[in-house]
Amino acid sequence: MALERLFRRKRPSGGNRDVPELWTKCEACGAQIYKKEFQENLHVCPKCGHHHRLPAQERVAMLADPGTFQETTRLRPLDPLGFVDTKPYVERLKAYQAETGRPDAILGGTCQIGGVPAVLLVMDYAFAGGSMGSVVGEEIARGAERAAEEGRALVIVAASGGARMQEAALSLMQMAKTVMSLDRVWARRLPYVSVLTDPTTGGVTASFAALADVILAEPGALIGFAGPRVIRQTIRQELPEGFQRSEFLLKHGMVDRVTDRRRLKEELVRVLRHLHPGVAYAPGV
């Protein structure tokens, strides 16, 4: 019995439960990736190049010049309709806020991108699927107005499932509001660049995201209005290979360039320096 107790396999103690996982798995190829390498590679799989979703804070750190970002998005959502589905909307909001640390599905502010003054707005898919409700629409409108007033470029990184159903018509009206706000940017002849990431769908695609002077997209991003499953069921036909992915949209003229995330800032700087009226463009930059 003594020998049996000596060699009996011990179960791990509860003290190891708080030790962070060191590895993550690629959603596309299944490769095991060291987490530190994964984060340093901006959540892009080093084996197959699959672009995983990137938190809004990391996206801002990736694009804004160090030390220049000043956050302006502080609005908090309300529940004017008293909406309840399987649970009250206010409870869903509290859960998303606790999970993301954000008041709503957008993070934005003023910054410089490659020395070019800009308003940068990044949608956060982790918050209610990046859905556009009253707060997201208002923050985008205010961001566009700020860009026009201060002579800044406007850069919006989209990641959204579309309009927020819990806000009904109040959500849908944000489509018109965001589009109208862009007029002020264009009136000042300032550049507006849209970056489409996985996924960009619904009312976001059908409004401000598709109206930029230059539209960049990340590789493999799902971009469209309705999803492929809904379209397939509606038209009762098989869809083309890669339908609604960024490479397919590039081929058919909906986006201007598909850019690897690791080179996205470089591409963005080149575009902004070329288009911003207050910045002298240097060939080769």
UniProtKB/Swiss-Prot annotation:
Pathway as given in its UniProt record: Lipid metabolism; malonyl-CoA biosynthesis; malonyl-CoA from acetyl-CoA: step 1/1
InterPro entries from the xrefs?
AcCoA_carboxyl_beta (IPR034733), Acetyl_CoA_COase_Trfase_b_su (IPR000438), ClpP/crotonase-like_dom_sf (IPR029045), COA_CT_N (IPR011762), Znf-ACC (IPR041010)
Phylogenetic classification of the source organism:
Bacteria, Thermotogati, Deinococcota, Deinococci, Thermales
Which organism was this protein described from? Answer: Thermus thermophilus (strain ATCC BAA-163 / DSM 7039 / HB27)
Q: Where in the cell is it found?
A: Cytoplasm
What is the protein's quaternary organization?
Acetyl-CoA carboxylase is a heterohexamer composed of biotin carboxyl carrier protein (AccB), biotin carboxylase (AccC) and two subunits each of ACCase subunit alpha (AccA) and ACCase subunit beta (AccD).
Ranges for domain CoA carboxyltransferase N-terminal:
22-285
GO biological process entries: fatty acid biosynthetic process; malonyl-CoA biosynthetic process
Instruction: Enumerate the Gene3D superfamilies for this protein.
Output: 2-enoyl-CoA Hydratase, Chain A, domain 1
Query: Which domain of life does the UniProt lineage start with?
Result: Bacteria
What does this chain do? Component of the acetyl coenzyme A carboxylase (ACC) complex. Biotin carboxylase (BC) catalyzes the carboxylation of biotin on its carrier protein (BCCP) and then the CO(2) group is transferred by the transcarboxylase to acetyl-CoA to form malonyl-CoA.
* Chain positions recorded as Zn(2+) binding sites: 26, 29, 45, 48
Key words of the record: ATP-binding, Cytoplasm, Fatty acid biosynthesis, Fatty acid metabolism, Lipid biosynthesis, Lipid metabolism, Metal-binding, Nucleotide-binding, Transferase, Zinc, Zinc-finger
Which chemical reaction does it catalyze? N(6)-carboxybiotinyl-L-lysyl-[protein] + acetyl-CoA = N(6)-biotinyl-L-lysyl-[protein] + malonyl-CoA
Tell me if Zinc is a UniProt keyword of this record.
Answer: yes
Query: Member of which family?
Result: Belongs to the AccD/PCCB family.
The protein here is known as: Acetyl-coenzyme A carboxylase carboxyl transferase subunit beta
Provide the cofactor list for this protein.
Zn(2+)
How does the cofactor attach, per the note?
Binds 1 zinc ion per subunit.
